[in-house]
Swiss-Prot record:
Residues where ATP binds: 51-58
Name of the protein this chain belongs to: Tetraacyldisaccharide 4'-kinase
GO cellular component, one term: plasma membrane
Similarity comment: Belongs to the LpxK family.
Source domain of life: Bacteria
GO biological process: lipid A biosynthetic process; lipopolysaccharide core region biosynthetic process
Enzyme class: transferase
Organism: Bradyrhizobium sp. (strain ORS 278)
GO molecular function: ATP binding; tetraacyldisaccharide 4'-kinase activity
EC number(s) reported in the record: 2.7.1.130
Length: 335
């Protein structure tokens, strides 16, 4: 899905026109969110966001995976597997599954941590525990009430914030903000920007801790791409954020090709990218998530195959994040 431009502008005639639908959608979503969920039997940390689209949940999940392992935990990620055909529950096997089976994000994460995909999230809990999960990390699912969360960590892109702060379809919010704030345990702002700080102020005013983090590119990949004119393409929630990160790393972006989030690349898409790269003598670069969806696709000219631009999340104050996680795990196990 490609987000409408008016979602990220001050309230417009489009958002006003869609307000009645938003009120209905928001009321139903808020009522569903208030339903009780099952107890997983192990602590559950949910990494979610207030709005549809990307905000940096996947790198946050991977950063928390490393933090939890440093505390002696055995995390297992639980994902709905958006874009995959398998309903699950199934343990993702990178050697046997493709993005069309389990979704691009679960497949990408499975290279680093055990990942269970289950369209009905509650059904995936047993499989996660069978693989010795001491903690379940939910990738998304904040608005899904089926599993009780012991820590709900909300991720917001500092540069984008919440757009026009209207509920879908008038804006990007999944439900009205007040019920979401009530269920938020902490906020993580990724990157810098006034839009993110506005969200941080509101969450802090509600008495919830606010953390900050930055996405750091792989230095080796940056060095290998330096000095090469690039054609950058991305099918993620916010392609422009990817393009900005490339430029912020000092790389020369000659052309950009944004695609909708989770875009299933066709042979025509690949041919168009290769033709442009050949014609303009550009190297292709994309995100790790997009490269996962392209895995197994043939390239007539292997030297033109795209290179991934991996990023990792670094907490500004890892000690504070670690302390919150430890307290929440302890409280969950004591209850």
């Amino acid at each position: 899905m490609r987000e409408p431009a008016f979602w990220h502008r001050p309230p417009s005639w489009q958002s006003h026109l869609l307000s009645p639908l938003s009120m209905l959608y928001g009321a139903v979503a808020a009522r569903r969110m208030a339903q009780p969920g099952i107890k997983a039997g192990v602590p559950v940390i949910c990494v979610g966001n207030y709005h549809v689209g990307g905000a940096g949940k996947t790198p946050t999940v991977l950063a928390l995976t490393a933090l939890l392992r440093g505390q002696g935990e055995q995390p297992v990620v639980l994902s709905r597997g958006y874009g995959g055909r398998l309903p699950g529950p199934v343990l993702v096997d990178p050697a046997a599954h493709g993005a069309a089976d389990v979704g691009d994000e679960p497949l990408m994460m499975a290279a680093h941590v055990p990942v269970v995909v289950s369209r009905a999230r509650a059904d995936g809990v047993g499989l996660a525990k069978a693989h010795r999960a001491s903690v379940i990390l939910m990738d998304d699912g904040f608005q899904n009430p089926s599993i009780t969360k012991d820590l709900a960590l909300i991720v917001v892109d500092g540069g984008r914030g919440l757009g026009n702060a209207r509920v879908f379809p008038a804006g990007p919010l999944r439900t009205p903000l007040p019920p979401q704030l009530a269920r938020t345990d902490a906020l993580m702002i990724i990157g810098r920007g006034e839009a993110g700080e506005a969200v941080a102020s509101r969450v802090a005013a509600a008495g919830k801790p606010v953390f900050r983090a930055q996405l750091q590119p792989d230095a080796g990949v940056v060095a290998s791409l330096a000095g090469r004119p690039l054609l950058a393409f991305a099918g993620i929630g916010d392609p422009q954020r990817f393009f900005r990160s490339l430029r912020a790393s000092g790389l020369e972006i000659r052309a950009e090709r944004p695609f909708p989030d989770h875009h299933p690349f066709t042979d025509g898409d690949i041919k168009a990218l290769v033709d442009q790269a050949t014609r303009e003598q550009l190297a292709l670069v994309t995100t790790e998530k997009d490269l996962v969806r392209l895995r197994g696709r043939g390239w007539d000219h292997p030297e033109l195959a795209p290179m991934a631009f991996p990023v990792t999340l670094q907490f500004d104050d890892e000690t504070a994040v670690r302390s919150l996680v430890a307290r929440r795990l302890s409280a969950a196990r004591a209850s």
